[in-house]
Curated annotation (Swiss-Prot):
This is ATP-dependent helicase/deoxyribonuclease subunit B. Belongs to the helicase family. AddB/RexB type 2 subfamily. The heterodimer acts as both an ATP-dependent DNA helicase and an ATP-dependent, dual-direction single-stranded exonuclease. Recognizes the chi site generating a DNA molecule suitable for the initiation of homologous recombination. This subunit has 5' -> 3' nuclease activity but not helicase activity. The gene is rexB. The keyword ATP-binding applies. It is an enzyme of class 3 (hydrolase).
């Protein structure tokens, strides 16, 4: 028979030449068979094109039963569909992975390099791909053995790799024999089958390939021996006697020509004279691009005179990918509206579509452009896949919160009789309670119901009928899980083989209606005319069924141990890997649509305009990395040792890089008239991109101007607006906002656009809505008196910390305490929980020693340890601290908390040996807190008979008596380092200590009834911690203490009291009775050699009065502002740039943007204690600071 080549560069129409030849032969021999072979993904378009070409001038219809357009695998179906071989089951990628997984386990003792790799994620899939590459390249296990024998002594690792590949490949071939067919084996089988057939009446026309695998070349050799074969190559000339140099621009096509030519000679097949495609398919501009590109990539490239290409070559730089894709959509729509183009005339190409994947649908939908994206979409994200993974994870991780919720949120397991809306609402309630109480593990399996309670300052734990109803709904979900999953897991545990595991899983899914729910989803998608989505549920279920069949066939007889947890995990991983490799079959929904694809995929040549998007130096040329088991170095070593076999492997990274100019050349010339090169200048996240060197070379040669596209429409643009009504509305809003900011008029063309959008029924409502946003200012409105009264009444009962929050940000106060918004409660140990724990323990500890009438200085270490252990045991029983008993991690944290409490208790004892200050009372209430009352609260009358009542709880009140003069001080426990900040006190951010001190002084009779003239000692912070010392902190004095074993004394200054201290010499002497001079280890002051005391924390009684008076003013001013309805969005900004927004849970509500003129931080000045006191004295009108 014969072989004929159709050659020519990309400028020429190889398709037309082949179809013309086919048509001529068909008219001469209409009874013979004709096959047009193309890559699979362009088969449909090629068939349509060929049928169009075969129509006669007189008849619009053509009967072409003798003409078939096939891919190579479809050709196998055509010839072999009725043979016994073709009836053997196909094996999927998932099945291949399962088979390779089994082979690795069976042969692990023989393996040298791969023995321990089976457990590594991704290795099985990587090995499977390598085996398929060897099979496609027709490299047998015997070839691998020969390769290994030819390696030198220095190539030990490669020899081990080939040794293991030989073992697995041999076992792979044996396991597949007559049991399964995988797609690559079909080509071999077809070749063998056709060798036994008569094909003299057949004609084969091959187009769209630049190279063939070894399998495909063997098939073509068989075809040319028995039939007429014509192959079209984009190739500048013939290479009958010698393949081109590796750096030759047409290397791939030239090498393929040479190999096929040599096969024809070897098999005595006549080679017809080459036919040069002579029909120019490109405009002169693109033909000039063809000449230039080929010339520039060829040695000694000759100078070419540029031709006018302005209307057919464009280079466009957009601000980001979003602006780039919007420009492409706008341009396509503009060109279609000229009436000269249809949507099917456009092709959008890029090297990798992934960076654009999230933008394609919204932008093209906005511009009302029908499109088809031929990027394969995997099934990994389908809810069925998540259901299967989480169904097994719940068992593997024993009802972990994340797994149970993910399982239920697939919405494939729903209680019978419950609507999807009811299920979602109940599941949300259930999840909230789970997060609040930390339910997981055995909590799902207990017999008693979970209880829903409301807790808060305004709902004191009282249960209502509504609470009971919500409790029932929540437990409906819990009972469903309890009734559904445990029986399934018991059945899984009882399974003895892989086959039984599959039976249990399949029956569970059928019994619970998963298959019916998937069909329901399909019907919903069809009803909504979502054709692509409608096919996904059935395709995913079908893939799953095939994987189960393959698992049973390959691993069904594998025994499962009694504790089969690890084997079930492997089963889950095999399913996950299978779905990750499985892809949806994609069907174009219409003929007239824009196609998006990647430049590495072959395209038909009938389109008019190509947009090469993403033309940056990152991907053009692409940065190629070889991830196969046989690395580039391995391939080079094999090439050096085994030159005949190695070329049958896939190209190395270097070979693929060398092919980049040719691959992009095909993409540049994929359409007939025009090409747009577009690229983003950045990714919108700070990364800048450069133009592709390929495009830069083209631009320089043809002297093209780069068109710049901004992210937003320009106010100065005079162009007529283009786009759909939805895209025009987006652009109009941008232009209007710019005009508003620049205080200029909107251009006339945009005013016209506005009028049209307002008149059109489909756009009228949204236009009105969006234009309202132009007048929106991100600033809260002042509350009306009615709303204020409704929220707060006429009395504000508040803790002082709430008012501190008001001074941090008024709007945050309104959200939290006016609207009572709160974050969803989560079962975790927060800093607040830790603080409550410390407060509870210290309260119990002080009250215990007071109740037993034990003097703190008299306690020894053993007594303290016993007392602390008693206190901790009772504290752990409190419901709010049950989290400490929940997990092993919490157990560790509990140990740390216990060590801290013991260390603090020892520190209190040690401090008591050096001070006369003694704890008097702990956790002292003032004002009304819930149903409890304590000391008299601070009440402040405001205008309009309104009142602020401050309440709270003082951690500890200490007492000291000097010469019958009682002193009272307050102590506030902190879990982090604190000191009194005069600036924060001045701005209302630190009201607590002064308020507590004023409360104690105000109600001193209730504290010390027998005394009438109590003086303040100070207000102190105590940092509760288990301290560690750095080397820098180990002074000579501390080293001496350490050597003497005085460890407690060495750590004494780690528990120093910081805060306000009254500057009273007699008082200070009694606060630290052992201080001779230097820094006190107990309090934040030092004693000079002169006998005087020094500290920035010292204040006189007069200064303390000033601070407390200012504190009162701040409380009253906050109350006045709250009752006035002030809700300003005014977060504070400290001099160190920390601000009130950093940790706020309401940031998504604030929408605070410092770039907006109405959003401003309230800047705090950097005031020290002297500056604060001076301002307070000035406010009082007294210049005396003492």
């Amino acid at each position: 028979m014969s072989l004929k080549f159709i050659l020519g560069t990309a400028s020429y129409d190889h398709h037309q030449a082949l179809v013309t030849n086919l048509k001529a032969t068909f008219q001469e021999k209409p009874q013979e068979r004709y096959f047009y072979l193309v890559p699979n993904h362009i088969k449909f378009e090629s068939e349509v094109s060929i049928l169009e070409a075969l129509k006669s001038d007189e008849n619009d219809y053509v009967a072409a039963s003798q003409i078939q357009v096939f891919s190579l695998t479809r050709l196998a179906w055509y010839f072999m569909k009725n043979t016994p071989y073709y009836q053997i089951p196909r094996i999927s990628t998932a099945g291949l992975n399962m088979l390779v997984f089994r082979l690795l386990q069976e042969h692990q003792e023989q393996l040298q390099l791969f023995r321990g790799e089976v457990r590594h994620t991704g290795f099985v899939a990587q090995l499977t791909k390598q085996l398929l590459e060897l099979k496609i390249g027709c490299i047998t296990p015997a070839d691998l053995t020969a390769m290994a024998e030819n390696l030198g002594d220095q190539q030990v690792e490669l020899a081990k790799k080939l040794h293991d590949l030989t073992i697995i490949a041999t076992a792979f071939e044996a396991a597949m024999q007559k049991r399964f067919i995988e797609n690559t084996a079909l080509i071999d089988a077809l070749t063998l089958f056709l060798q036994q057939q008569t094909l003299t009446d057949c004609h084969f026309y091959v187009e769209g390939f630049a190279q063939f695998t070894a399998q495909e070349q063997a098939l073509l050799t068989t075809l040319m021996q028995q039939s007429e074969v014509q192959i079209g190559f984009i190739l500048d000339r013939a290479y009958p006697n010698q393949q081109p140099d590796g750096l030759n621009f047409f290397f791939q096509a030239g090498r393929t020509y040479y190999n096929l030519y040599q096969q024809a000679r070897l098999n005595h097949v006549p080679v017809m004279m080459d036919q040069m495609a002579d029909s120019q398919r490109l405009t002169p501009a693109l033909a000039a691009l063809d000449q230039f590109w080929v010339s520039s990539e060829s040695p000694g490239n000759r100078k070419l005179s540029p031709v006018p290409v302005a209307d057919h070559l464009h280079v466009v730089a957009a601000e980001n990918r979003y602006a780039e894709l919007r420009y492409v959509a706008r341009e396509i729509r503009r060109l279609v509206q000229t009436g000269h183009y249809r949507y099917r005339d456009f092709l959008i190409l890029t090297r990798h579509l992934a960076p654009y994947q999230t933008m394609i649908a919204p932008i093209l939908t906005e511009y009302e452009i029908p499109y088809f994206c031929d990027l394969p979409q995997t099934m990994a994200a389908h809810p069925l896949v998540s259901l299967l993974e989480k169904l097994l994870d719940v068992n593997l991780h024993f009802y972990r919160y994340e797994d149970v919720m993910a399982l239920l949120k697939t919405e494939l397991l729903i209680p019978k009789g419950m609507s999807i809306a009811e299920f979602r609402a109940d599941l949300d309630l259930c999840e909230n309670l789970i997060l609040k109480n930390g339910y997981e593990g055995k909590d799902w399996l207990n017999d008693f119901d979970w209880q829903f309670y409301r807790f808060g300052s305004y709902q004191e734990g009282t249960r209502t009928t509504q609470d009971e109803a919500l409790t029932e709904r929540i437990n409906g979900i819990r009972r469903y899980v309890q009734a559904t999953l445990p029986p399934f897991y018991r059945a899984l545990k009882a399974a003895k083989t892989g086959r039984q595991v599959v039976q249990v899983l399949y029956q569970f899914l059928i019994d619970h209606g998963v298959d019916r729910q998937l069909l329901h989803w399909r019907d919903q998608a069809l009803a909504a005319n979502q054709v692509a989505q409608a096919g996904q549920p059935e395709q995913t279920w079908s893939t799953f069924m095939q994987m189960l069949d393959e698992y049973v066939t390959l691993l069904g007889d594998v025994s499962f141990e009694e504790d089969n947890t690890e084997q079930l995990n492997e089963f889950k991983q095999l399913l996950s890997a299978g779905f990750a490799a499985a892809q949806y079959a994609q069907i174009p929904s219409t003929l007239d649509q824009v196609v998006l694809s990647e430049s590495g995929m072959v395209q038909t040549k009938k389109r008019q305009i190509t947009f090469m998007i993403g033309s940056t130096d990152q991907v053009m040329p692409d940065q190629i990395e070889n991830t196969a088991l046989l690395t580039d170095q391995d391939r080079q070593r094999l090439l050096d040792n085994e030159g005949q076999v190695t070329p049958l492997l896939n190209e190395s990274s270097v070979g693929k890089m060398n092919a980049e100019p040719y691959l992009n050349y095909l993409a540049f010339l994929s359409s007939q008239t025009t090409v747009y090169f577009t690229y983003p200048l950045g990714n919108g996240e700070g990364t800048a991109f450069k133009i592709s060197p390929y495009v830069e070379r083209i631009r320089n040669h043809f002297d093209l101007t780069i068109q710049k596209i901004a992210a937003e429409q320009s106010l100065q643009s005079t162009e007529t607006p283009q786009g759909s009504w939805r895209s025009l509305l987006s652009d109009l809003i941008q232009v209007s906002r710019q005009a508003q900011e620049n205080q200029t008029l909107i251009p006339e063309q945009w005013l016209t656009t506005y009028r049209l959008l307002q008149q059109a029924p489909q756009s009228q409502f949204l236009t009105t809505q969006l234009f309202q946003s132009l007048n929106y200012r991100n600033e809260p409105e002042r509350l009306t008196p009615e709303i204020v009264t409704g929220l707060y009444g006429n009395e504000i009962h508040t803790s002082i910390s709430k008012l501190e929050e008001f001074y941090q940000n008024q709007y945050a106060y309104f959200l939290k305490y006016g609207l009572k918004l709160q974050e969803r409660p989560v079962f975790e140990l927060t800093p607040a929980n830790t603080g409550n724990f410390y407060h509870e323990v210290m309260d119990r500890f002080i009250k215990l020693i007071q109740g037993q009438q034990i003097a703190l200085p008299e306690l020894d270490d053993q007594q303290i340890d016993k007392l602390v252990s008693e206190v901790l045991a009772k504290t752990y029983e409190q419901p709010e601290f049950k989290i400490l008993n929940k997990t092993a991690r919490m157990g560790y944290i509990r140990q740390q908390l216990m060590q801290t409490v013991k260390r603090v208790s020892l520190a209190l004892r040690n401090q008591s040996l050096s001070t006369n200050l003694r704890p008097l009372a702990t956790e002292v209430l003032f004002g009304q807190v819930g149903a409890e009352k304590g000391l008299q609260g601070l009440n402040f009358m405001l205008d309009d008979h309104r009142e602020v009542k401050v309440r709270g709880k003082i951690d500890r009140i200490d007492q000291l008596t000097i010469n019958n003069q009682p002193y009272l001080g307050i102590v506030d426990y902190k879990s982090s380092q604190h000191s009194f900040n005069f600036r924060d006190a001045y701005y209302g951010l630190a009201l607590q200590m002064l308020t507590y001190l004023e409360t104690v002084l105000q109600d001193q009779q209730a504290i010390l009834p027998a005394n009438s003239a109590v003086k303040p000692a100070g207000a102190f912070y105590l940092h509760l911690k288990n301290p560690t010392l750095t080397l820098k902190q180990l002074t000579k004095k501390k080293m001496g203490q350490l050597q003497k074993g005085e460890f407690d004394q060495m750590l004494l200054d780690q528990f120093k009291y910081n805060g306000l201290i009254v500057n009273d010499e007699e008082l200070l002497e009694n606060l630290d009775t052992t201080l001779v001079n230097g820094q006190s280890p107990l309090f934040a002051f030092s004693k000079l050699k002169s006998g005087k005391f020094s500290s920035k924390q010292l204040v006189t009684l007069n200064q303390l009065d000033l601070l407390m008076a200012h504190n009162e003013d701040l409380i009253k001013e906050a109350g006045q502002a709250i009752f006035a309805g002030d809700t300003a969005l005014n977060p504070i900004m400290r001099p160190d740039r920390t601000n009130a927004l950093t940790l706020s849970p309401f940031k998504s509500i604030f929408q605070f943007d410092a770039m907006l003129p109405e959003n401003n931080y309230r800047q705090l000045e950097a005031l020290d204690e002297k500056a604060v006191l001076e301002r307070l004295m000035s406010k009082k009108g007294d210049g005396n600071l003492e």
